[in-house]
Amino acid sequence: MANHAPFETDISTLTRFVMEQGRKAQGTGELTQLLNSLCTAIKAISSAVRQAGIAQLYGIAGSTNVTGDQVKKLDILSNDLVINMLKSSYATCVLVSEENTNAIIIEPEKRGKYVVCFDPLDGSSNIDCLVSIGTIFGIYRKKSTDEPSEKDALQPGRDLVAAGYALYGSATMLVLAMDCGVNCFMLDPSIGEFIMVDRDVKMKKKGNIYSLNEGYAKDFDPAINEYLQRKKFPPDGSAPYGARYVGSMVADIHRTLVYGGIFLYPANKKSPSGKLRLLYECNPIAYVMEKAGGLATTGDKDILDIVPTEIHQKAPVVMGSSEDVQEFLEIYRKHKAK
């Protein structure tokens, strides 16, 4: 009879992983405190998302946020959870949220050395129809010795210490990117811990799926439309790419990370700067993509090289498998040279 224990007794949890990385880096433990607090917020949001219908958390709260999106009740709850947990970590000094017009400066007695930019509930327009939604975050180290201010958040994505997202889907998955690579953790509700399920994730160099909202095609740059035409009707006679678009960035990005392919949210005539926000959507996801061997670009430059000028700045994005993004860039540069 096989000697299988009914329970794993040496579990690789997110907390354990982060502590190990901190020990290797001979850190102070502040980043571990921060990530543990963020995890608690994510667990609470995951629980709220699953109870939303019963707890009457669906629907609109009756206002719009700074970027013009209608604010849902779950948005407000999620935002408050993340802010309160990060404040209580004693590891942050400045917080930037999609839901707040201005940066949040942490009170002096609770300050640490990190700046966190986050979207507490990405894809919240999909809440009422039960489509997967998520939380996105990027963590920077405060560089100046001055009093904390909004300027501390205006760092390029290359300066990220850690970034990632939580996906509230058929299970709750947390994807964390750090210098050591990209690792995936799944929430085990029976013990309330994130368990490592994929270590040092690497993307396929080329996929067979493209993802964007083609409803805006009439306003796209000609380079986008030429690229899409190539994917649908390959000139070499190969199989066309499949089209997949959920409309929840975290869901579309996670599929791209797992299966390969390309995700596009380009600029168009109505949104010449794109629609996704640089600090708490584009940069964290671009960081994950690059650490997993993919690419992330605006067309003109790498997303992680953009130096932000304001906290709710927007950027067009094309990201995914390296060969797919390179193929797009060849077409984009050809059109730009005309």
UniProtKB/Swiss-Prot annotation:
GO MF term set: AMP binding; fructose 1,6-bisphosphate 1-phosphatase activity; identical protein binding; metal ion binding; monosaccharide binding; RNA polymerase II-specific DNA-binding transcription factor binding
InterPro entries documented for this protein: FBPase_C_dom, FBPase_class-1, FBPase_N, FBPtase, Fructose_bisphosphatase_AS
UniProt cofactor(s): Mg(2+)
EC class name: hydrolase
GO CC annotation: cytoplasm; extracellular space; nucleus
Induction / repression: Up-regulated in pancreas by obesity and dietary fat intake and in diabetic animals.
Record field: catalytic activity: beta-D-fructose 1,6-bisphosphate + H2O = beta-D-fructose 6-phosphate + phosphate
Free-text activity regulation comment from the record: Subject to complex allosteric regulation. The enzyme can assume an active R-state, or an inactive T-state. Intermediate conformations may exist. AMP acts as an allosteric inhibitor. AMP binding affects the turnover of bound substrate and not the affinity for substrate. Fructose 2,6-bisphosphate acts as a competitive inhibitor. Fructose 2,6-bisphosphate and AMP have synergistic effects.
Residues annotated to bind substrate: 122-125, 213-216, 244-249, 265, 275-277
Residues recorded with modification Phosphotyrosine: 216, 245, 265
Record: residues binding Mg(2+) 2: 98, 119, 121
Record's keyword terms, sorted: Acetylation, Allosteric enzyme, Carbohydrate metabolism, Gluconeogenesis, Hydrolase, Magnesium, Metal-binding, Phosphoprotein
BP GO terms, sorted: cellular hyperosmotic salinity response; cellular hypotonic salinity response; cellular response to cAMP; cellular response to insulin stimulus; cellular response to magnesium ion; cellular response to phorbol 13-acetate 12-myristate; cellular response to raffinose; cellular response to xenobiotic stimulus
Domain of life according to the entry: Eukaryota
Modification N-acetylalanine occurs at: 2
Cofactor binding summary note: Binds 3 Mg(2+) ions per subunit.
Enzyme Commission number(s) from the entry: 3.1.3.11
Pfam families in alphabetical order: FBPase, FBPase_C
PANTHER family, sorted: FRUCTOSE-1,6-BISPHOSPHATASE 1, FRUCTOSE-1,6-BISPHOSPHATASE-RELATED
Family assignment from sequence similarity: Belongs to the FBPase class 1 family.
Subunit details: Homotetramer.
Name recorded for this polypeptide: Fructose-1,6-bisphosphatase 1
Naturally occurring in which organism (per UniProt): Mus musculus (Mouse)
